[in-house]
Amino acid sequence: MSEGILFIISAPSGTGKSSLIQGLLKSKTLYNTRVSISHTTRIIRPGELHGKHYYFISKKEFEIMIKQEYFLEYAKVFSNYYGTSRKYIEKMLFSGIDVFLDIDWQGAKQIKCKMPKSKSIFLLPPSKDTLYKRLRERGQDSDSVIANRMEKAVDEMQHYSEYDYLIINDDFKQAVNDLITIITAEHLCLFHQKNKHNLLISNLLKC
């Protein structure tokens, strides 16, 4: 059995990253895909569940886990910690399951250094106006928080060229199809095909 592929997906807040990942999970793909559940110290939002969307823990707990080297990567965003469990990722990949990591560019850089075979995807909005509108429609943040998120979004988007793939989330269905295409392409690359069909290839090449 071949190992799963680790996919990193990053985007500014409000770009539709979470919706895109959920759209992928609901689609009929040929591959077993999971989303890594991160640990965070931020306050739980309405509709979120512990253990489903995030593992919500205290700052003290998070900092103890950092010292124990529990995280494959971690970062501080808007005064809150976010981190990815090393054991969870390794277990899923070894079981042949593709894993999606929803992390920012800082975390992506850490993962790329530690797991160079991982593939990274950056998601962009079709325009700044659209991004602003999406943030407003959430109805969760004040004007000052939205202004801060817009400013941070511009900074985050500067890093798009550090990624392997780029998706523009203008049309949702097309964006989901683009994501599925990326997954399919990676599974068809020589490295994964060779591992998956090693016995078949060996028999074909016998004299």
Curated annotation (Swiss-Prot):
Q: At the top level of its lineage, which domain of life is listed?
A: Bacteria
Q: Which GO terms describe its molecular function?
A: ATP binding; guanylate kinase activity
- CDD domains according to UniProt: GMPK (cd00071)
Principal localisation:
cytoplasm
What are the alphabetically sorted keywords of the record? ATP-binding, Cytoplasm, Kinase, Nucleotide-binding, Transferase
EC numbers, comma separated: 2.7.4.8
Q: Cellular component GO terms, alphabetically? A: cytosol
- InterPro entries listed in its UniProt record: GK/Ca_channel_bsu (IPR008145), Guanylate_kin-like_dom (IPR008144), Guanylate_kinase (IPR017665), Guanylate_kinase_CS (IPR020590), P-loop_NTPase (IPR027417)
Query: What broad class of enzyme is this?
Result: transferase
Keyword Membrane listed? The answer is: no
Q: Does the keyword Secreted apply?
A: no
Q: Which sites bind ATP? A: A11, P12, S13, G14, T15, G16, K17, S18
- Specify the Guanylate kinase-like domain's residue ranges: 4-184
Where it sits in the cell: the answer is: Cytoplasm
Q: Which PROSITE patterns match?
A: GUANYLATE_KINASE_1, GUANYLATE_KINASE_2
Q: Which reaction does it catalyse?
A: GMP + ATP = GDP + ADP
| Family, per entry | Belongs to the guanylate kinase family.
Q: What does this protein do?
A: Essential for recycling GMP and indirectly, cGMP.
Q: What is this protein called?
A: Guanylate kinase
Organism in which the protein naturally occurs: Buchnera aphidicola subsp. Acyrthosiphon pisum (strain APS) (Acyrthosiphon pisum symbiotic bacterium)
Output the lineage of the source organism: Bacteria, Pseudomonadati, Pseudomonadota, Gammaproteobacteria, Enterobacterales
